[in-house]
Design a protein with these regions (language model features):
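Central cavity-lining transmembrane alpha-helices of secondary-active solute carriers
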Residues: 55-74, 93-95, 160, 282-295
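Glycine-rich segments within core transmembrane alpha-helices of 12-TM secondary carriers
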Residues: 126, 148-173, 196, 322, ...
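Low-complexity, proline/glycine-enriched hydrophobic segments characteristic of transmembrane helices
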Residues: 324-451
Length: 547
């Protein structure tokens, strides 16, 4: 009997992990093919409608996920884990498949982007319900003392889903050629999701309900109002707040910094070509991914709290030197130019905006904003010098001074012409000063860059490997799905999701390419302090505690 139970647990872990990989595959396709999708569905939309669609696409990726956590978390605590995440994967899979057959703007007009955004919103809602269900289900099947190890496999699924989506896209692109892929071949990865959906539904139909939930339901102890019980009672709401600020907020920024901001830093700041950057990131993920399981297993031995909080602290203490070293090994010419050719922006401080632009639709057209935006895009460190009110901003590069221009009120065509001229003159000046247009491939120390990126990924595995077990153990069975899902998706959807745009705005405002790292550092330190004093250790808790 014990052997059969162990085999069932292992099969549950394996099958649930596979299904969650498929769901992440569906979610990542949109991001991986966003440029082609934009050309197919938004090319004929007027600016006002495009702004609305951009906001909604952004909401689907980040802001909508907590609402999915509420909807499906409640359902999971009312009717069961198995059937709830069966619903989430059907919504995700069907939404992805429909994108593959959806006519473009040229065929259906305005209806095409509207339907696309609705499908994307459904994807965000489904993803908001998937994680809590998968983590709860696996944890409630896991043997006591091994929940960290079992749930850590769920933590590998986002990385594996990204790998799978990139592999399918690369294979299709190579087979068809770039022109055919951009015209219609991009639909194939979306259409293939119907096969993955069929496999996932079959797997989940064969799974049994969580034994802990099943027993609780048989004894009539399920919650009649999970949302009210989870967040309307202070004793439970307090735990959810501690889980957010003392757990998932720090976990999210460390996760995004190690996997997404590192890629952004390589391609946008250090100007490493996209293919090389993707290979470097992929190698670091390949090396680091097994450590999700290692740290999950270790958390069963020494506790969830020391590993997660330790990951937040060591990340906060080492981000600046690590990213400085990445610059040194990935683009030494840029590092040298920053040291030898200092740049100063002279501007009226009242004209300098904090360029926070999460959906990419805001326009920054003061002379200061135009100057700083150019320098930030070109990875040029600069200092700030205050000028008299109303002064048009200028940029000093050594002995040269280039005057910016005020773009407010200019017609679109004139604004573009002035911007192009300013950018051209500034580009010539910074190239003469030694700032490279891109990283020289022959000067990139790929081995050292992969080592440094792997260190960042190891921080990710420290905070992310044990987090599912921690969240599951914080809440009683009757409200577990609901209560753990919301802090997880607020942390990852909002604290983590805003990281790239917040970091870029901080860089543009201060003139330091590393200044954006203060955002994840501050959040990680906040989580360390709150978690240290308020977060309980949970590894020895019994999940059969329903009260």
């Amino acid at each position: 009997m014990a052997i059969f139970a162990a085999a069932t647990r292992l099969a549950t872990k394996r099958e649930q992990t596979l299904c969650t990989v498929f769901e992440w595959y569906d979610f990542y396709l949109y991001g991986s093919l966003s440029a082609i999708i934009a050309a197919q569905f938004f090319s004929g939309v007027n600016p006002t409608a495009a702004f609305i669609f951009a906001l909604m696409a952004f909401a689907a990726g980040f802001a909508v996920r907590p609402f999915g956590a509420i909807v499906f978390g409640r359902l999971g605590d009312l009717v069961g884990r198995k059937y709830t995440f069966l619903i989430t994967i059907m919504i995700m899979g069907l939404s992805t498949f429909i994108v593959g057959i959806l006519p473009s703007y040229a065929t259906w007009g305005i209806a095409a982007p509207i339907i696309l955004i609705l499908l994307r919103l459904f994807q965000g809602l489904a993803l908001g319900g998937e994680y809590g269900g998968a983590a709860t289900y696996v944890a409630e099947h896991a043997p006591h003392g091994r929940r960290g190890f079992y749930t850590s496999w769920i933590q590998t699924t986002a990385t594996l889903g990204l790998f799978l989506s990139l592999l399918v896209i690369l294979g299709t692109r190579t087979w068809m050629g770039e022109e055919a892929f951009a015209e219609w071949g991009w639909r194939i990865p979306f259409l293939l999701s119907i096969l993955l959906l069929a496999i996932s539904v079959w797997i989940r139909l064969t799974l049994s309900e969580s034994p802990v939930f099943k027993r609780m339901k048989e004894e009539g102890k399920t919650s009649k109002a999970p949302l009210t019980e989870a967040f309307g009672r202070w004793e439970n709401a307090k735990v959810a707040l501690i889980a957010l600020f003392g757990g998932t907020a720090g976990q999210a920024v460390v996760w995004y910094t190690g996997q997404f901001y590192a890629l952004f830093f390589l391609t946008q700041t250090l100007k490493v070509d996209g293919a090389t950057a993707n290979i470097l990131i992929a190698l670091s993920l390949l090396i680091g991914t097994p450590f999700f399981v290692v740290f999950g297993w270790l958390s069963d031995k020494i506790g969830r709290k020391p590993i997660i909080l330790g990951g937040c602290l060591v990340a906060a203490l080492t981000y600046f030197p690590l990213f400085s070293l990445i610059t040194h090994y990935a683009n030494p010419a840029l590092e040298q130019a920053q040291a030898s050719a200092p740049v100063t922006v002279v501007a009226d401080p009242s004209e300098c905006s904090f360029q926070f632009n999460p959906v990419g639709t805001s326009k920054f057209v003061t002379s200061c904003d135009i100057a700083k935006s150019f320098l930030a895009r070109n990875s040029v460190n600069y200092s700030n010098e205050a000028a008299a009110a109303g002064t048009v901003a200028s940029i000093k590069v050594g002995d040269q001074v280039i005057t910016s221009f005020a773009g407010a009120g200019l017609p679109a065509n004139e604004l573009k012409a002035r911007s192009d001229a300013f950018n051209a003159s500034m580009t010539e000046v910074i190239r003469e000063a030694g700032y490279p247009a891109k990283a020289d491939p022959t000067q990139i120390n790929k081995t050292m860059v992969v080592v440094l990126l792997t260190v960042l990924v190891l921080f990710v595995t420290m905070v992310y490997g044990p987090i599912a077990a921690l969240l599951v153990e914080l809440f009683p069975t009757r409200i577990r799905y609901t209560a753990m899902s919301l802090p997880y998706h607020i942390g990852n959807g909002w604290f983590g999701g805003f990281l790239p745009t917040t970091a870029f705005a901080m860089v543009a405002a201060t003139g330091n390419i590393y200044y954006g790292l203060w955002y994840p550092i501050i959040v990680a330190v906040m989580t360390f302090v709150i978690g240290l004093f308020l977060m309980p250790e949970t590894k020895d808790r019994d999940l059969r505690d329903w009260h």
